[in-house]
């Protein structure tokens, strides 16, 4: 019933619309008839014809039109309207097109400069990267294993770095090319920069390959990633064809190393995403935090050439004049995320080396550093022992990485060969983007990520159980006092000291006498005293040995000998 009612209403309004249209037509007819009657009256005066038709009066015409409209209103038939396209639509299209052309011709250079210069921000704050915050940790822990006692010591450390060259990974090369525009926001600090894509002015770029002179600089009309990459490829090919002289180009090497304690710490120390290191080198951060492993990472950045983009005198120099600040705002530009300009990109390869050991020696870092610097560690027994119980991994990113994609070995000489191999630029060993530097578009100040992080430096020291060998060969009566502490740690890392003493302290011993006193691996503060009876009334007892800080060793040999008036004592270690 409701549908039927709607149809009737629709028909009624259709008839009303038709009636209005008909009224307009009738009005035109009445006007036309009136003009026709005037014409006929004029003709009557000059004709001789006796029979002249009487024109319909306007009243009659109106009456017929009214009757027709009533019939239309009372009819159930739909009135179809077919409006014609008005010529005005075409005119509106032309007008809109003209307005668009005017907008594209408008110069917004002054507006862009004013707005970017007026951006209010702190360079260090907008690019601050706050890593881990350490609240609770166990400062010390003791672990007993057979004849070993391992002390794991943890210290809270802070690291604050501001690197200006940022490592490039494959996923961001399309937004870290020379002259690219970026936002100084969280994404930039995490090596995932947000690009600002808009209409650009032509941009000059320069490559620092030797011998090219003026040919080393070209202008890219539309500096997109594809166009800039093509221009760089052309420059490199020109150098190979015309300026290399068939020679290779040695790399400029930058080297950094650091022990690994946590993800945020190694990111800040080496300026590289820990996920890349973890994925390529397989760093076991859990074992490191437990003190079970010690790991050092070295990064060799081998640069073949650098491509620089000419810095703009004013911010608007990089934009087409049609670009508005409103458009830049829509794409993220603000006080919290000011625009950046990629000023240069280094091309070459990066070699990451992981040195890993389960040794608890305090000389691990020194041994690893010596190996990386090419020092002959075979002459140093401690270093040699550490390296013999270590494993090494090298990963090459960029250049001819297929040859040495990942190498795992126990022989560090193999790692040295990986570092040296393919360290020269040639057609067979091409360069890849490895790092870039950006500047703030407002003032061309270098944009450095301000890394602030806390981390726990974990060191582990391994102690082995020992013993004291007492030997009395003197011509006198002797007495001993042997004391030591046994160290443990509670669940909060607090040191717990248990006092220990030899059961035969102060017992008189005649020569020859010998015995063995076992010491646990957690023994500290060892004191050894031996005295002899002189028989002299004024000096009945005389000390032969009195050592209060004897170090724990596998064997501590305590020997006393001589006569009452000339005793002799010594402590040796084995």
Swiss-Prot record:
Q: How does it sit in the membrane?
A: Multi-pass membrane protein
Q: Where is this motif: Cholesterol binding?
A: 564-565
Any one GO MF term held by the record is: toxin activity
* PROSITE patterns reported for this sequence: THIOL_CYTOLYSINS
TM stretches of this protein: 263-276, 283-292, 361-370, 378-390
Keyword list, A-Z: Cytolysis, Hemolysis, Host cell membrane, Host membrane, Lipid-binding, Membrane, Secreted, Signal, Toxin, Transmembrane, Transmembrane beta strand, Virulence
Question: Which regions are flagged for Low complexity bias?
Answer: 37-52
Instruction: Please indicate if the UniProt record lists Membrane as a keyword.
Output: yes
Q: Where is the composition biased (Basic and acidic residues)?
A: 53-64
Q: Where is this region: Disordered?
A: 37-64, 84-111
One GO cellular component term noted in the UniProt record for this chain: extracellular region
Query: Which parts of the sequence form the motif Conserved undecapeptide?
Result: 532-542
Q: Where is the signal peptide?
A: 1-36
An example of a Gene Ontology BP annotation on this entry?
Answer: killing of cells of another organism
Localization in the cell: Secreted; Host cell membrane
How does this chain assemble? Homooligomeric pore complex of 35 to 50 subunits; when inserted in the host membrane.
Functional note: A cholesterol-dependent toxin that causes cytolysis by forming pores in cholesterol containing host membranes. After binding to target membranes, the protein undergoes a major conformation change, leading to its insertion in the host membrane and formation of an oligomeric pore complex. Cholesterol is required for binding to host membranes, membrane insertion and pore formation; cholesterol binding is mediated by a Thr-Leu pair in the C-terminus. Can be reversibly inactivated by oxidation.
What family is this?
Answer: Belongs to the cholesterol-dependent cytolysin family.
- What protein am I looking at? Streptolysin O
Q: Per the UniProt entry, what species is this protein from, by scientific name?
A: Streptococcus canis
Lineage runs:
Bacteria, Bacillati, Bacillota, Bacilli, Lactobacillales
